[in-house]
Amino acid sequence: MAAAFGRCCRVLRSISRFHWRSQHTKADRQREPGLGFSFEFTEQQKEFQATARKFAREEIIPVAAEYDKTGEYPVPLIRRAWELGLMNPHIPQNCGGLGLGTFDACLISEELAYGCTGVQTAIEGNSLGQMPIIIAGNEQQKKKYLGRMTEEPLMCAYCVTEPGAGSDVAGIKTKAEKKGDEYIINGQKMWITNGGKASWYFLLARSDPDPKAPANKAFTGFIVEADTPGIQIGRKELNMGQRCSDTRGIVFEDVKVLKENVLIGDGAGFKIAMGAFDKTRPTVSSGAVGLAQRALDEATKYALERKTFGKLLIEHQAISFMLAEMAMKVELARMSYQRAAWEVDSGRRNTYYASIAKAFAGDIANQLATDAVQIFGGNGFNTEYPVEKLMRDAKIYQIYEGTSQIQRLIIAREHIGKYKS
């Protein structure tokens, strides 16, 4: 019975993927480059959005609080998202994937995050892990590591952050020593999303022992199988928010990696790692917008039901003005990630817009979650109501994939550079 059900799910998923892939190809042929923004989604985009929205509201929201309480990894939801074609949207068509653009992936991400950003991060942690291979892998690497992720719901992880090197990626200490046709990896990584669930990792390590070597030549990117001898996976971290997401430290001790698992070549790793951020930060930003929209909706619903001083909360100008400010902010944050995603899909370097979207949406998610708690009053401080979880979940958006302060450094650098030129 179970085997038959599994075969049925695979057939249905294949049909769904074929339909969406066909529609995506048709839409691409019809799209004329250079026309600028369109505020009307394509039929395919509407379909993706509707599917993700239905999944979030009917399957994620009812169990989100329990996953937050237990910290259990949401395997059933991950499998279901995979079956629906909502997982791994960036995998190219020639590897069996949908080959969606960043804009389309962002629409899915926003809807999933509306349901629960912990679940959304668990589902979409793959996007960051996959991106270095998508942008820099050879055909053999892509088919081997991306192709198998379209055959079953496997996970991967992006192993860059270390205990002493977070925003300062150039400061990582993990070393890769070349010996013949293989590399010996030694070092420690920290705060790795999907670290204990991944089947393989993208790993950034220092391959040039010269401490004065520039970052764009000192680091190499590797694909490392998670079951390679010498890898020690740490305990699941107990985080403030997004608790069902799997976050761990990983130790690499004399881990052997074949040269065929090097991306591009020696010294190309830093550029690859940073290039991945340009493509994934819009998606992360869309997750922050999904949380912000949820905060606005919950606050509005509560204000329409709760009475104080003899009338509904929403009838008090102080509250209605708060909701107006929240609505303004969420719409502007949405526009920021859509602009950044559009830049990616147009084939342009989007570092500037990606950082604006990441910083702004992360800040807005925190502001709206805080405002929602305020509107709920004492109830907002209690776990029986949804907004306290939103407030805890929101904070990480100002930290992971580059802190809000780092984004501002990038924005300033890009802005000043454009001004001088």
UniProtKB/Swiss-Prot annotation:
Keywords: Acetylation, FAD, Fatty acid metabolism, Flavoprotein, Lipid metabolism, Mitochondrion, Oxidoreductase, Phosphoprotein, Transit peptide. Its main location: mitochondrion. Gene3D superfamilies: Acyl-CoA dehydrogenase/oxidase, N-terminal domain, Butyryl-CoA Dehydrogenase, subunit A, domain 2, Butyryl-CoA Dehydrogenase, subunit A, domain 3. Octanoyl-CoA binds at residues 167, 278, 281, 349, 351, 401. It is found in: Mitochondrion matrix. It catalyses: a medium-chain 2,3-saturated fatty acyl-CoA + oxidized [electron-transfer flavoprotein] + H(+) = a medium-chain (2E)-enoyl-CoA + reduced [electron-transfer flavoprotein]; pentanoyl-CoA + oxidized [electron-transfer flavoprotein] + H(+) = (2E)-pentenoyl-CoA + reduced [electron-transfer flavoprotein]; hexanoyl-CoA + oxidized [electron-transfer flavoprotein] + H(+) = (2E)-hexenoyl-CoA + reduced [electron-transfer flavoprotein]; octanoyl-CoA + oxidized [electron-transfer flavoprotein] + H(+) = (2E)-octenoyl-CoA + reduced [electron-transfer flavoprotein]. One of its GO terms (molecular function) is medium-chain fatty acyl-CoA dehydrogenase activity. FAD binds at residues 158-167, 191-193, 306-308, 316-317, 374-378, 402-405. Pathway: Lipid metabolism; mitochondrial fatty acid beta-oxidation. The keyword Phosphoprotein applies. Its EC number is 1.3.8.7. It is an enzyme of class 1 (oxidoreductase). The active site is at residue 401. GO terms for cellular component: mitochondrial matrix. Residues 1-25 form a transit peptide. Pfam families: Acyl-CoA_dh_1, Acyl-CoA_dh_M, Acyl-CoA_dh_N. It comes from the Eukaryota. Its cofactor is FAD. The keyword Transmembrane helix does not apply. The modification Phosphothreonine is found at residue 351. The modification N6-acetyllysine is found at residues 69, 212, 217, 259, 271, 279, 301. Homotetramer. Interacts with the heterodimeric electron transfer flavoprotein ETF. This is Medium-chain specific acyl-CoA dehydrogenase, mitochondrial. It comes from Macaca fascicularis (Crab-eating macaque). The gene is ACADM.
